[in-house]
Curated annotation (Swiss-Prot):
Domain CBS: 93-154, 158-217
Residues reported in the UniProt entry to bind IMP: 306, 341-343, 364-365, 388-392, 421
SMART domains documented for this protein: CBS, IMPDH
PANTHER family with a match to the protein in the record: INOSINE-5'-MONOPHOSPHATE DEHYDROGENASE (PTHR11911:SF111), INOSINE-5-MONOPHOSPHATE DEHYDROGENASE RELATED (PTHR11911)
Protein name: Inosine-5'-monophosphate dehydrogenase
Keyword entries, A-Z: CBS domain, GMP biosynthesis, Metal-binding, NAD, Oxidoreductase, Potassium, Purine biosynthesis, Repeat
Summary of activators and inhibitors of this protein: Mycophenolic acid (MPA) is a non-competitive inhibitor that prevents formation of the closed enzyme conformation by binding to the same site as the amobile flap. In contrast, mizoribine monophosphate (MZP) is a competitive inhibitor that induces the closed conformation. MPA is a potent inhibitor of mammalian IMPDHs but a poor inhibitor of the bacterial enzymes. MZP is a more potent inhibitor of bacterial IMPDH.
Entry's Gene Ontology molecular function annotations: IMP dehydrogenase activity; metal ion binding; nucleotide binding
Protein residues bound to NAD(+): 251, 301-303
Length: 494
């Protein structure tokens, strides 16, 4: 067997070849799939990293049209709360609204509103054995401001003269009722007066602001969450499912391992309807085995990330473009989407990844600098930066719920001596996520215009690459000039 198989390429090694086009960038469609059954309006996924994706960024990305994957360096309860926060941020009809019983106190209402960042709570009778909740009233922030005693029952201040609607109401009719009655919340009941949901004026406004938002069938923003291969993983999945998660990602550095295959199969056996992403991998054989285990999408990328040191610490990996092409060819046999994870520096790299066969791209560093990311903001020499670290860094692996299992290292070891496969650093602050997304998608649409393709599927099928030299790469970047004003989509820091 030959030891050296073939040359492998990454994004900087190639360019897409321009073609005849009658397609304008504004006419292109960038919808895609993140798993077999989950569509996204933008082919962007945020990485499950503790300096990248928590609820705030996941909300912003889903509203833009992509999807965020909440990292797992959190306790089970906290990670589930992040998922629930995304799912409750925007809804058509809130099907399981938070409620209070009639004997609750005003202080309990205050605590509940603060904990869940809500401004109104339906009040119901204690449930029947069948679990039905008979609506009795509603208590809002306005009611709470009118009282000074927090120990009184909420029945003393709640509104009982209620404006309600039936379950079959559409949002246009709901908006009209809300405006006519000058109220912010419309309670949805059945014919017997049992609470079935809640429609808020704020949710209707949010839908208008973000028409391309990535939502589930109930009008809620979509969100994913990472899980590992620890003994408590199924308990974590249980909590995430209860919180309403749309997809879980079995997230490891080496997805082609028996522990990952077993975990994917176990999750799918317990939750056959739950979408499961598995990874990371770099070979067709790995894709085949993960799909056979039950994966609904496969994440590709061994070591391409800017903060990843796997390729130099372990000497293992695959240049990302070749990895995507090899894996996508195998995935196409079972109609399984590929997520290209890592190595994206510019919007042009997104185009190359999709043209190579990926359905979406997962990014960490590009999103880590945004206002919505959870990384610490750092001031250095008069400039704003945000902390960014790999999940294989010492800091990330040493957290109480750290990522050591992602790299198959024992979290219970007394010495806590890990072998890191990532670093900790800082990146320039980039401002709001929606501005970053605008530039990324603008670059992708421009690429599609140059290539004469109208959608992602055509980008995958009807494009060609040309290999370039190091001189060609230098020529591709600005040269023989001193940049006096940086563009919003190009930086010399890469």
């Amino acid at each position: 067997m030959d030891k050296i198989l073939y040359d492998a390429l990454t994004f900087d090694d190639v360019l897409l070849v321009p073609a005849y086009s009658n397609v304008l960038p504004k006419e292109t469609v960038v919808k895609s799939r993140v798993t077999r059954n989950i569509e996204v309006n933008l082919p962007l996924v945020s990485a499950a990293m503790d300096t990248v994706t928590e609820a705030e960024l996941a909300i912003a990305l889903a509203r833009a049209g992509g999807i965020g994957i909440i990292h797992k360096n959190l306790s089970i309860d906290v990670q589930a709360r992040h998922v629930a926060k995304v799912k409750r941020f925007e809804s058509g009809i809130i099907r399981n609204p938070i409620t209070l019983f009639e004997d609750a106190t005003i202080q309990e209402a205050i605590d509940l509103m603060l904990r869940h960042s809500i401004s109104g709570i339906p009040v119901v009778e204690r449930p029947t054995p069948e679990g039905c909740l008979l609506l009795k009233g509603i208590v809002t922030n306005r009611d709470l401001r009118m009282t000074t005693s927090s120990n009184e029952k909420i029945t003393t201040i709640m509104t009982t003269d209620l404006i309600t609607a039936q379950e079959d109401i559409d949002l246009l009719a709901a908006e009209e009722i809300l405006m006519q009655n000058k109220i912010e919340k419309l309670l949805v009941i059945d014919e017997e007066g049992y609470l079935k949901g809640l429609i808020t004026f704020k949710d209707i406004q949010k839908r208008k602001q973000c028409p391309d938002a990535c939502k589930d069938m109930h009008g809620r923003l979509r969100v994913g969450a990472a899980v590992g291969i620890r003994s408590n993983t199924i308990t974590r999945v249980d909590a995430l499912v209860e919180a309403g998660v749309d997809v879980v990602a079995v997230d490891t550095a080496h997805g082609h391992s028996q522990a990952v295959l077993d975990m994917v199969a176990t999750i799918k056996e317990k939750y056959p309807e739950l979408e499961v992403i598995a990874g990371n991998v770099a070979t067709p054989e790995a894709v085949r085995d993960l799909v056979k285990a039950g994966a609904d999408a496969v994440k590709v990328g061994i070591g391409p990330g800017s903060i990843c040191t796997t390729r130099v610490v372990a000497g293992v990996g695959m240049p990302q473009l070749t990895a995507i092409m090899n894996c996508a060819k195998e995935a196409a046999k079972t109609d399984t989407p590929i997520i290209a994870d890592g190595g994206i520096k510019y919007s042009g790299d997104i185009s190359k990844a999709l043209a190579a066969g990926a359905d979406t791209v997962m990014m960490g560093s590009i999103f880590a600098g945004t206002d919505e990311s959870p990384g610490e903001t750092i001031l250095y020499e008069g400039r704003r930066f945000k902390a960014y670290r790999g999940m294989g860094s010492l800091g990330a692996m040493s957290e109480p719920e750290g990522s050591s299992d992602r790299y198959f290292q024992d979290a219970s070891a007394e010495t806590k001596k890990y072998v890191p496969e990532g670093i900790e650093g800082r990146i320039p602050a980039k401002g709001p996520l929606d501005e970053v997304v605008y530039q990324l998608i603008g670059g992708l649409k421009s690429s599609m215009g140059y290539c004469g393709v109208k959608n992602i599927e055509e980008l995958k099928k009807n494009t060609r690459f040309v290999r370039i030299t190091s001189a060609g790469l230098r020529e591709s970047h600005p040269h023989d000039v001193m940049i006096t004003r940086e563009a919003p989509n190009y930086s010399t820091s890469h």
